[in-house]
């Protein structure tokens, strides 16, 4: 610390007062951290050290030694005061710092002191200029809250008395400060002129030592910007606040304008764990039950009621400005300015009620820890309710009972509750949040709180009864109790039932109550206010309305005066509930006959309230009392006002505590496993502290991304499934949060995952025992039986003992048998068959247990005694005694021992005899159950002897009995409660091997063993290793199938019982660094014992690796290589292939007699983890040359050269003999692999002469290994070298040599990788080869191989591959791998035989073939087809035959003749070009491959695919040697005159590898097609438009023509109509004249007729009518 004191560097922090170096050296804990480096960077400081009293006692409080040390460093000690090396603290934006001053700079007349008054303090009066800051309000409020929690009761009793010594306070805020004192109890810090102080605060899981200086911030008006008391020279509030602000600055503020995040001052001052609960409307009832359990409850009593009445009378007599014991209501008129006068009475008021309530049956907290104890008789309701919607209520009765697991005495956990509300910010985006904030602000004003001044309020008590006991009703005369009449209400309307609202109130305490607030009343119910809109009158009526102002006012006064009776019942008489009376009136009703008893009193209270309302704002005092004030809130209003409640748990009140802190700058998640097993419901308090930034790490700037909060999750975990468990806990925090996890009865496994960028601390408390830690710590706890399992087994075993003990007692035997049945058969089943099965399982298990525990020979009547106890005759048949329980469940009847058929008479006689004996035996058993009989005494004595043995180790035998029952897998056992714990029961076994140091980029096998599975079970293997890459493979040896993996990890899998077991293989890859020797552990986790066991005693860790390296030469069959394997003894092997191209798809196969036994595909590498090679029919030395593929050996001269090369290369090899390659991206073992297999044939002793011929074949898939131009050039050079070697060998073909050429076989035996001497090895091979060639009459043809790939020759630009075969160290010499050239050797042997029989046959055949081809191939000019060289045209078979069949002169002559002929016939290549493009090429390839005989079907398809691709991409090409190898009879002469290229489709049906070049080519083709289509479409559309325009013109012309024709027709028609009309009119006029003439004539005739008629006749007629 001395070096720190002399630091003069100004540290400018970024949103934090601290910095840190990311190195691990900056995390010392448990000791005083001293930074002695003089070159420490700015902003980088270690975490605050853990608290140590020894460090404080040895602390240097002045410059002293530090100045001398600075002299040594070359810096003069100019400053004689301490300056915090972490820099100045950062205050919220609402407080503007203008200057920093020391106490000596502002106090000239007095000497500063740390503590002035040890009994009282006032942090309110002198700090009103700070109350605009949310951070300062929280600091002041929470210091008051802690003071009230610890010292409220003691000070209340102290101020009651008139005299006495000052009390001994349990908590003093200045005791967190240390200066010039020792770390002892009750120390007093002193003023330090040097300015160095140490503060003790709780942070990140432990008490920390925080060093501060005494520089104080001031604003422009010279106001101190830190809380202070009324004594300006008292320093403890400023010093304590500086340390608290340091902690608060670490927190991340979620809202932009919030000054305080999730940091809580109470947690820093006490170390109590804050549980945060959001007040959600759906869980209000559960929150009330929780608070009712936690908080002390107010209860009515005679003494309390009398004191309350006296307090009410006193409050009326006191002045409005003075507050008494119960004077809260008149307090609103004028607040007291004298703090000393008010404080004693307020403290007395606050804490007296809990003292009186101690007489109530529910226990209350003492004066020191009031409000922190849980009630022992709390409700048993089980629910979950937390920050995320599920938080369990504290079930105290179970927690207390579960303390039997702890050694401490029974106690309850202490808790403190306070509530918070969010300030109303206008930048809130969510409109619903704004609505809630508005409602909250309105309610808070009613209770004298301001939503602007957000701060925590302490919740002190709960109340479920009236504050003042209602007066008792007068006693009724006895005669009125007889036949009471119901009160009748005369009305025609239905009566509404008034539901009485339950009384639920909470008392809160806050120093900001009524701060700068005008109390007012807001009536919420208007029962007496009548509506102006009367019934039957529309709203728009013109009738004048009657003013009801006076009446309404009168009613409101009456309303308030009447309701205040309910108010007095709902709120304390000394405190105001503004606007709440009407609500309670509705709940309690107006029908109470005794409501008017307190009417006058309440009217006076209302008048005082009204007088207060009439005062102007200027008359309100600007100061407030520094002591917390209390008020009762209705619970519903409480939920509206506040958004969160904090429950602080005292960790020391819990039986068990676990703490773990981890600090590292890492993004990794830390996992903890938790085991808990209890017979009672489990409650775990989980507290999580996260450190998300420190110093420069995570510094907040404008452009920086948001910092993620710390995260802690807890989920149920099971090793038997990959499915994530159900989430039971999720905590997001930037500081510290806690929650309670509720688990049901039983055994549980939880997985905690903690994430925090810088560090975290986890603290778990519980009343039940639990185990938490790493997997190896927790896992052994799941092997024993669970508590419920043991309890159930003991219950059954004790019931059995009770039956045996009372077997002689007639009265108790039947009850004991019923108890036994209840114990093992708790839930009756309706299924008779299942019930019978359950009883059989129980009886058989009990019989096996009793039989097993017999140390000596059992008594003769042992079986009879057991049957007498259980009364089961069919149980102990001899045929069923040794059958397993699972098999026995399915056996109901005994099968006859013979198949002999009996007659009906014999069967009837046997049944009769059996029935007689059975009846006799049953009567004996029943007689043995009758007490005082001879049989009963004998049976009882026998059972007592058995019980004596069982009772010696009762628990062990009880568990064995129940486990036997569970092994039967009977469905009835699922009804046992302990059956749920079977999911968490496990058994595990560890297997450890060691591996040696490995070089970089090396692949090796760590573990390979076969495990035998005795029974079907779910198993999960887990690997523990430090290797960077390690993959475990598990192979079923019966089916050769691999157990599935997810993300390269073996999943939990049901392993069935098989014959050959399962092989576990672990492969590893070292990566770019050296891997030191270490241990590798495999853990097998199963559901039950016995687990699979090794096939031998101990695992093997010594393996031999054979490496074969060679270059990839493309071929038509796409085969990478083929190697034959011969073994002398059956043994397993691991096969791995790696290619230089990391994205090449390859397929690795093991063929047995050309049949695929197992295959694996991979990208860049492929592995067959385990394959068991069987012994061949004969030994390797006795095999014929046709079936033996030994290592190739070169000629004498080549051997010498090869040995020299090897000697030169050996120097550059690694010391272990394994090649060290710099290639990083080849052979990564994390490549996904697919392994397929064919069911293997069972080993049968009936076929002992079977010859196993194994071939290891690897092929390239999808043409995924295209070679670049440089690689093609390199491969072509290899081919030319191979041809030259072939010709060179042809000159000495008479020499007898062995097959093949030496490959690069690097043999790595064990992990030591010791390389066998090449010279010795070759000598042995040479001698063995000489013996073989001496026995063989004809040696096979030697086909030399290109020089092998050596470590120094590994070039990533060259296409090479590596084949590794891993066998065990002691079996490596019995495992031979040779190149497979059997088919080529057979062909060459056949040709050699023909050539030996008939010399010159090969030359003749070649000439005949060329002559035949030249006869029909169409000839072209030399310009079209240039001469073809001999190497390009000579078929491979011809070259081989020429080299083997004739001598050197003959071969030269034949070669020359062939060259001449082929030059003449070279013009026929044009026909071959056409022939390549025809469909007949496929038939040719098929027929050719079928004739060759040794080519597999995959090879055919790949060759056809390659040929088609070449034809399509390259088009016509020159004649190739591959086509010349085709048989001449397949070429038809008709092809010369037929061009079939137009009928050949240019698409390929076989799959091709989608490369970038192919994608680009396809994209270009598609774009060209689209472009052409668009052009064609444009042309078509333009033509269509032109046609349409022409059609429209033609249509218009036709219409015009038809219009003209119609007009002319109309004109002609009109002319005709006019002439016709004129003629018609003439005719009509003539007809009209004619008619008129006729009419005139008729009229004249009628007139003449009338004249001629006589008149008398007319007169006669008239007379006749009169008559």
From Swiss-Prot:
Residues 1588-1629 form a coiled coil. Residues 554-566, 1301-1315, 1451-1468, 1512-1522 have a biased composition (Polar residues). Heme b binds at residues 792, 824. Its main location: other. It is found in: Cell projection, Cilium, Flagellum. InterPro entries: Androglobin-like, Androglobin_II, Androglobin_IV, Androglobin_V, Globin/Proto, Papain-like_cys_pep_sf, Peptidase_C2_calpain_cat. It comes from Homo sapiens (Human). GO terms for biological process: proteolysis; spermatid development. This is Androglobin.
């Amino acid at each position: 610390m001395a070096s720190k004191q002399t630091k003069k560097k100004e540290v400018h922090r970024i949103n934090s007062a601290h910095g840190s170096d990311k190195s691990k050296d900056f995390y010392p804990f448990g000791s005083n951290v001293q930074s002695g480096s003089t070159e420490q960077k700015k902003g980088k400081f270690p975490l605050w050290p853990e608290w140590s009293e020894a460090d404080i006692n040895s602390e240097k409080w002045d410059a002293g030694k530090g100045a001398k040390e600075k002299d040594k460093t070359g810096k003069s000690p100019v400053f004689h005061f301490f300056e915090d090396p972490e820099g100045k603290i950062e205050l919220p934006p609402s407080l503007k710092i203008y200057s920093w001053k020391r106490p000596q700079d502002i106090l000239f007349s007095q000497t500063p002191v740390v503590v002035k008054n040890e009994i009282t303090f006032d942090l309110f009066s002198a700090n009103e200029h700070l109350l605009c800051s949310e951070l300062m309000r929280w600091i002041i409020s929470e210091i008051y809250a802690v003071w009230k929690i610890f010292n409220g009761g003691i000070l209340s009793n102290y101020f009651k008395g008139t005299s006495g010594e000052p009390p001994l306070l349990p908590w003093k805020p200045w005791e967190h400060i240390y200066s010039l004192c020792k770390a002892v109890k009750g120390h007093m810090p002193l003023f330090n002129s040097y300015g160095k102080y140490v503060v003790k605060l709780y942070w990140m899981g432990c008490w920390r030592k925080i060093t501060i200086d005494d520089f104080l911030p001031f604003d422009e008006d010279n106001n101190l910007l830190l809380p202070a008391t009324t004594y300006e020279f008292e320093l403890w509030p400023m010093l304590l606040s500086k340390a608290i602000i340091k902690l608060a600055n670490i927190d991340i503020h979620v809202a932009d304008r919030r000054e305080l995040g999730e940091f809580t001052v109470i947690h820093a001052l006490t170390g109590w764990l804050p549980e945060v609960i959001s007040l959600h409307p759906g869980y209000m009832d559960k929150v009330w039950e929780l608070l009712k359990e936690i908080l002390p409850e107010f209860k009515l009593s005679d003494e309390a009621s009398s004191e309350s009445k006296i307090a009410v009378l006193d409050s009326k007599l006191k002045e409005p400005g003075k507050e008494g014991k119960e004077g809260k209501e008149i307090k609103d008129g004028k607040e007291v300015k004298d703090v000393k006068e008010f404080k004693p009475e307020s403290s007395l008021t606050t804490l007296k009620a809990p003292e009186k309530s101690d007489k109530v049956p529910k226990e209350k907290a003492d004066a020191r820890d009031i409000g922190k104890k849980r009630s022992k008789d709390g409700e048993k309701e089980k629910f979950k309710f937390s920050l995320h919607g599920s938080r369990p209520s504290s079930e105290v009765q179970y927690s207390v009972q579960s303390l039997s697991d702890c050694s401490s005495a029974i106690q309850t956990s202490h808790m403190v509750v306070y509530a918070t509300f969010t300030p109303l910010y206008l930048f809130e985006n969510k409109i619903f949040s704004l609505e809630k904030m508005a409602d909250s602000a309105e309610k808070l004003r009613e209770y004298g709180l301001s939503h602007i001044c957000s701060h925590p309020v302490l919740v002190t008590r709960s109340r479920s009864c009236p504050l003042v006991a209602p007066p008792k009703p007068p006693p009724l005369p006895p005669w009125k109790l007889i036949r009471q009449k119901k009160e009748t209400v005369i009305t025609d309307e239905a009566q509404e039932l008034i539901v009485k609202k339950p009384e639920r109130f909470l008392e809160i305490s806050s120093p900001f109550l009524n701060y700068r607030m005008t109390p007012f009343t807001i009536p919420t119910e208007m029962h007496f206010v009548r509506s102006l809109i009367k019934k039957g009158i529309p709203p728009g009526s013109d009738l004048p309305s009657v003013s009801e102002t006076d009446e309404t006012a009168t009613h409101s006064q009456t309303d308030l005066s009447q309701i205040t009776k309910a108010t007095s019942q709902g709120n304390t008489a000394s405190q105001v509930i503004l606007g709440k009376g009407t609500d309670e009136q509705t709940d309690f009703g107006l029908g109470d006959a005794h409501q008017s008893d307190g009417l006058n009193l309440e009217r006076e209270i209302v008048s005082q309230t009204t007088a207060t309302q009439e005062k102007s704002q200027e008359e309100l005092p600007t100061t407030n009392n520094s002591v917390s004030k209390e008020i009762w809130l209705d619970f519903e209003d409480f939920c509206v006002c506040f958004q969160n409640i904090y429950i602080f748990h005292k960790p020391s009140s819990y039986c068990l505590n676990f703490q773990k802190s981890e600090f590292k700058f890492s993004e990794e998640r830390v996992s903890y496993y938790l085991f808990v097993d209890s017979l009672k419901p489990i409650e775990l308090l989980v507290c999580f502290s996260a450190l998300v930034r420190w110093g420069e790490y995570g510094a907040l700037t404008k452009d920086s991304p948001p910092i993620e909060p710390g995260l802690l999750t807890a989920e149920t975990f099971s090793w038997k499934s990959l499915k994530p468990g159900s989430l039971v806990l999720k905590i997001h925090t930037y500081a510290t949060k806690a929650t309670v996890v509720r688990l049901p009865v039983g055994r549980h496994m939880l997985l905690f995952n903690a994430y925090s960028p810088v560090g975290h601390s986890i603290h778990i408390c519980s009343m039940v025992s639990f185990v938490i830690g790493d997997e190896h710590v927790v896992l052994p706890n799941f092997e024993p039986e669970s508590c419920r399992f043991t309890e159930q087994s003991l219950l059954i075993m004790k019931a059995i003992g009770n039956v045996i003990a009372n077997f002689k007692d007639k009265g108790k035997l039947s009850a004991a048998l019923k108890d036994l049945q209840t114990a093992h058969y708790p839930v009756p089943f309706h299924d008779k068959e299942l019930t019978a099965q359950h009883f059989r399982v129980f009886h058989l298990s009990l019989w096996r247990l009793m039989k097993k525990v017999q140390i000596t020979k059992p008594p003769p009547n042992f079986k009879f005694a057991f049957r007498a106890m259980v009364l089961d005759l069919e149980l102990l048949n001899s045929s069923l005694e040794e059958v397993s329980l699972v098999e026995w469940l399915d056996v109901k009847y005994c099968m006859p021992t013979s198949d002999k058929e009996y007659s009906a008479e014999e069967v009837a006689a046997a049944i009769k005899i059996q029935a007689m004996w059975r009846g006799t035996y049953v009567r004996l058993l029943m007689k043995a159950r009758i007490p005082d009989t001879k049989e009963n005494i004998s049976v009882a004595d026998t059972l007592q002897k058995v019980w004596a043995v069982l009772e010696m180790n009762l628990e062990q035998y009880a568990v064995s009995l129940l486990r036997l029952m569970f092994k039967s897998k009977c469905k009835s056992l699922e009804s046992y409660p302990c059956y749920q714990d079977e999911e968490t029961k496990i058994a595990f076994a560890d297997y450890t091997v060691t591996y040696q140091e490995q070089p970089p980029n090396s692949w090796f096998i760590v573990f390979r063993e076969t495990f035998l599975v005795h029974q079907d079970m779910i198993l999960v293997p887990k690997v523990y290793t430090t290797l960077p890459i390690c993959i475990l493979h598990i192979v079923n040896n019966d089916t050769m199938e691999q157990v599935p993996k997810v993300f390269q990890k073996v999943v939990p899998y049901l392993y069935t019982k098989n014959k050959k077991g399962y092989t576990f293989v672990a492969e590893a890859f070292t990566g770019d660094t050296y891997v030191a020797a270490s241990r590798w552990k495999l853990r097998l986790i199963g559901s039950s014992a016995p687990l699979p066991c090794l096939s031998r005693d101990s695992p093997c860790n010594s393996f031999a690796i054979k490496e074969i390296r060679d270059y990839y030469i493309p071929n038509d069959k796409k085969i990478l290589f083929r190697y034959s394997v011969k073994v002398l003894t059956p043994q397993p092997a691991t096969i791995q292939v790696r290619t230089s191209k990391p994205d090449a798809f390859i397929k690795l196969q093991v063929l047995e007699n050309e049949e695929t036994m197992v295959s694996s595909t991979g990208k860049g590498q492929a592995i067959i983890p385990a394959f068991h090679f069987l012994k061949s029919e004969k030994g390797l030395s006795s095999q014929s040359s046709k079936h033996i593929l030994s290592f190739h050996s070169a000629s004498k001269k080549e051997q010498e050269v090869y040995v020299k090369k090897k000697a030169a290369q050996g120097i550059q090899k690694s010391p272990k003999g394994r090649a060290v390659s710099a290639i990083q991206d080849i052979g990564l073992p994390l490549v996904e692999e697919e392994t397929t297999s064919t069911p293997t044939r069972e080993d049968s002793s009936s076929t002992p002469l079977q010859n196993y011929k194994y071939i290891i074949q690897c092929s390239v898939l999808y043409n995924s290994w295209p070679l670049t131009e440089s690689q093609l050039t390199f491969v072509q050079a290899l081919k030319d070298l191979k041809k030259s070697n072939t010709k060179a060998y042809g000159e000495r073909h008479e020499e007898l040599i062995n097959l093949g050429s030496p490959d690069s076989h690097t043999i790595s035996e064990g992990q030591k990788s010791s390389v066998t001497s090449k010279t010795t090895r070759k000598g042995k091979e040479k001698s063995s080869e000489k013996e073989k060639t001496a026995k063989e009459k004809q040696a096979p043809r030697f086909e030399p191989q290109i020089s092998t790939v050596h470590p120094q020759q590994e070039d990533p630009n060259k296409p090479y591959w590596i084949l590794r075969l891993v066998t065990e160290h002691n079996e490596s010499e019995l495992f031979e791998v040779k190149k497979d050239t059997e088919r080529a050797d057979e062909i060459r042997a056949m040709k050699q035989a023909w050539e030996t029989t008939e010399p010159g046959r090969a030359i003749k055949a070649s000439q005949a073939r060329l002559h035949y081809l030249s006869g029909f191939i169409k000839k072209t000019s030399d310009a079209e087809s240039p001469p073809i060289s001999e190497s390009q045209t000579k078929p491979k078979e011809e070259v081989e035959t020429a080299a083997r069949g004739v001598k050197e002169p003959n071969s030269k002559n034949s070669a020359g003749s062939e060259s001449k002929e082929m030059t003449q016939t070279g013009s026929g290549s044009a026909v071959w070009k056409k022939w390549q493009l025809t469909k007949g090429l496929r038939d040719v390839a098929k027929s050719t491959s079928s004739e060759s005989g040794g080519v597999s079907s995959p090879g055919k398809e790949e060759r056809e695919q390659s040929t088609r691709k070449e034809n399509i991409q390259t088009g016509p090409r020159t004649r190739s040697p591959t086509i010349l190898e085709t048989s001449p009879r397949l070429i038809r002469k008709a092809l010369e005159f037929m061009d079939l290229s137009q009928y050949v489709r240019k698409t390929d049906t076989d799959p091709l590898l989608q490369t970038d070049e192919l994608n680009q080519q396809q994209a270009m083709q598609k774009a060209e097609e689209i472009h052409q289509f668009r052009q064609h479409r444009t042309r078509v559309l333009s033509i269509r438009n032109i046609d349409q325009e022409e059609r429209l013109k033609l249509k218009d012309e036709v219409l015009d023509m038809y219009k003209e024709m119609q007009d002319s027709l109309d004109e002609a028609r009109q002319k005709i109509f006019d002439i016709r009309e004129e003629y018609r009119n003439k005719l009509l006029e003539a007809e009209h004249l004619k008619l008129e003439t006729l009419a005139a004539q008729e009229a004249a005739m009628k007139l003449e007729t009338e004249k001629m008629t006589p008149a008398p006749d007319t007169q006669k007629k008239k007379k006749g009518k009169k008559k």
